[in-house]
Amino acid sequence: MIRLIRWNNVQSLVFKRCLFVPSNSLTNKRKRRIPPSKPRSSNRKDGDIEPYRMTDQNQTPNTGSIARLPAEVKKELKDLRSFTKVIAQHLKPEQENDSLTSAEKPDTSQLPPIDIEEATDDIFGEISGTKKLSANAVPPPPPPPGLDIPDEIKERLGLLSELLVPAKTSNNKLPEKQVENNWKLLLSQLDQAGGLSGLSKRSVSKFFSKIPPKNLKNLIPMIENMYNKAEMSIPHPIYYMFVRSLTLGDKISDSQMQLINKYFQEISKQTDLKIDHYETMILAYVKNNHMEKIDGILAQMKKKNIEISKMIYTSIVRGYIFYQKDHQRALDTFDSMKFLSQKTQPDEKVYTDVIVSCVMHREIERALDLYYELKDKGMNVNQNLLSTLAKGCSRSKQFKTQAWNFLFQVYDHGWVPNLQTYEHMLYIAARDGDVELTRVLFYKMLQTNSVTIRAFRYLILSYSKYVPPHKRKEKHLILLNHKGQLFRQNILQDVDFSKPVHGFPFLPSSHIPDSKFVLAESSAIWAHTVMNNPSFLRQQTLVASYVSIALELGDFTEFKDRFDSASYLNTDGIPKVREIEIIEPRQDEPTEKATTTEEQNASSETDNNSLIRSPILNQLQQNINDNQFKAPRDSYLYNLAIKAAGKFKNYGFAQEILHERGQFRKSNSFKLLSPKQQNQDDFQFAGYLVECWTNMNLLEDAYAVVLSSVDRFPWSWRELGVLNNAAMKLGSLELAEAVRKVAQVTQVKHHGKIKRQDFKTYVMKRGY
């Protein structure tokens, strides 16, 4: 209780210990005597709370301290009002029902009765400081330490400076967001309290250096404005802080790069650029994807006799790998790091990046050599490196048996597989056609709510790679390893597909009996994804795997249905031309036409009965008329379509795809490709078209495709072997000879491989 006391006509706030004891009229109990408090011991232990000082009216007060007290109270009240005003500006009144800012009033009718005498003792013990902690009681945690803010800035901020805590807080779930809001609030209050005027440059620089770079990125305009108001010049360390904050993240926009160049110009006016400045500058150009400007920076460093550091080499290597996609130049820079000096030796991070680049470009043997070189140097191996090598080995026929060995090394190191490792497990099992294992791994991801679009794509890929047991000639890769056998057996027994997770339509069986099972389940999963995650279905790679399931396991009707329902022709950029085709039937054809119509109707009824499709897809397609659940067709989808036309020998569908592929070449999506990529896609489609006509025994049409593009495409025996074998089988020796001549001419022209006898003949004709 606080009592107001007057001494010499001066008001003062003095704490008095008073206790309210209820009377008998309230308690209906006998009054009990309050034992007098024990005198305080002068030998107070460390950590005890010092009780409030007792004051007697007869005591002579310290008039000097009492006279200064009202001024301190006024200052505290002024700071408190300013603090309240700033807080009120940042509150959002619309969040009235927020569970974090509002609380329900407790129901007092459900509270137990209170023993007033016992409560009185507790209150007395609390205010007198004599209550002891129980044996099991846990003392409250100490408040987090505040930031070391200069005193003159702390005085200007007042109570608001106590809001700031260090960025590394363990008890806060959202430390970054909380600190960012506090810094913005703090700078606003500092600006309103006079800004930087009257403060020393050293204190200002020390204060701004406390701001984390991630938060500083959004506060740069406010800080520059505060410097301008105070008519102070920004020192070069602050400019460098701005640059470091702007270089955070994976990419840097052109506008941010302009700011970085501006700040570096200001730094160069105040001091000479050091190695740290050049390292940050090169890193910024790498993230801005302007590697061509790095040569000029290196030339400046050479003029100033500044050696190229290891960090600069690392940034250049990462730029060639992840931004420029120039694998060869990345390898050249990596070799320079190894043989230049001892200071520039690459560490495990650089080795990991180069190994990832080798895996991306299908150079698995080089990746393995670098891996063993890394181990010989005694460097640490991380989990992402092992999982990347496992994924790369699964793509190679020579090293695919080592894929699961690298994954099991993750368990040998005692690591818990992260999301990337788990996704690579899915990929290896899917690429191997192990549908049972892929389904189980995906089921585990459903249970932990960690499903990604990449994992879903690998599940669909496993269906497209499925081979029935009676046709499979090789064991699954995981069964070639003893650990793999135990791993597969245990995880299959641990999953019960009869208990669906999140309604995902897995069929209630862990065993895959035949291809109809795969067709039915993939169709049901596609329908479920249309209803719940339609954004997944707009990727061409996913649609290609979904369509390939019908190509490998179904018939033409199944393929045509999936091709039309999951993809569409993007007409952006295609010129609109009206085509009118007039067909006049002959007078002697009515009987044949009627017969043909009856046959088509009968075949369509048979196809509809044999179609394995989810009933939900039929209902969805009746209500959906646009392409929001489809992916735009690309060159790979057209390659699959023309391949299906040849496999199922459907001439009409082949003509339809051939015409639509011509329209696709006029679209914006094809025009945006590089000329090299366009030529490569056209050559692949031409190769599949030759195979299509060959499967239909239209050998002359297939040879016409080759002959019309002999000067454009590097035809080889890989594309022409099917046509040559078909010509030999049908006894068309002239056509086979013509195909062999085309292969010889194109191989010599495009510096390809030729046979030894053909090379001898070529050298004899050349004469040298």
From Swiss-Prot:
S-adenosyl-L-methionine recorded as keyword: no
One GO cellular component term: mitochondrion
InterPro entries cross-referenced by the UniProt entry: Pentatricopeptide_rpt, TPR-like_helical_dom_sf
First and last residues of the transit peptide: 1-90
Entries under Gene3D superfamilies matching the protein: Tetratricopeptide repeat domain (1.25.40.10)
Any one GO BP annotation for this protein: mRNA processing
Cellular localization per UniProt: Mitochondrion
UniProt subunit comment: Binds to mitochondrial small subunit 15S rRNA.
Stated role: Regulates mitochondrial small subunit maturation by controlling 15S rRNA 5'-end processing. Localizes to the 5' precursor of the 15S rRNA in a position that is subsequently occupied by mS47 in the mature yeast mtSSU. Uses structure and sequence-specific RNA recognition, binding to a single-stranded region of the precursor and specifically recognizing bases -6 to -1. The exchange of Ccm1 for mS47 is coupled to the irreversible removal of precursor rRNA that is accompanied by conformational changes of the mitoribosomal proteins uS5m and mS26.
Stated family: Belongs to the CCM1 family.
Protein name: Mitochondrial 15S rRNA processing factor CCM1
Lineage: Eukaryota, Fungi, Dikarya, Ascomycota, Saccharomycotina
Gene name, Swiss-Prot/TrEMBL: CCM1
